[in-house]
């Protein structure tokens, strides 16, 4: 066994381990959504960003992109096609998130998708069209740091083992 063979083997394995995560989410506004919903949404965003960082993954969050003017649709479609893991915050059943989920269903294996949902007074359940998908109901954003994180770790483990 030559060192180059070991390096090539490592590179081949590393190439198949998920690194890129796309986050589909709504963009809250205290003025439009109210202070409480805004606070909850910001807490969810902060929690998922923390989890992704802890797992050394690259997050695509179009809401925080700082590259100047760009066509959000082109970037969104490209980044969804290129992501290794697709995460969607279904809370609020926002139209933009549902479009992103629909596009991802065509381009990302469902075994590499993860959804979570926090009910509110305005939106008490996941829309019918996506209710059959595997999603994590959460009461508080802290559950993203526990339950959702474990689900992401499971996806990473399955990818390392070549199962997905």
Model regions and ranges:
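Conserved N-terminal substructure of TIR/SEFIR domains
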Residues: 1-68, 77-80
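Cross-kingdom TIR/SEFIR domain
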Residues: 92-155
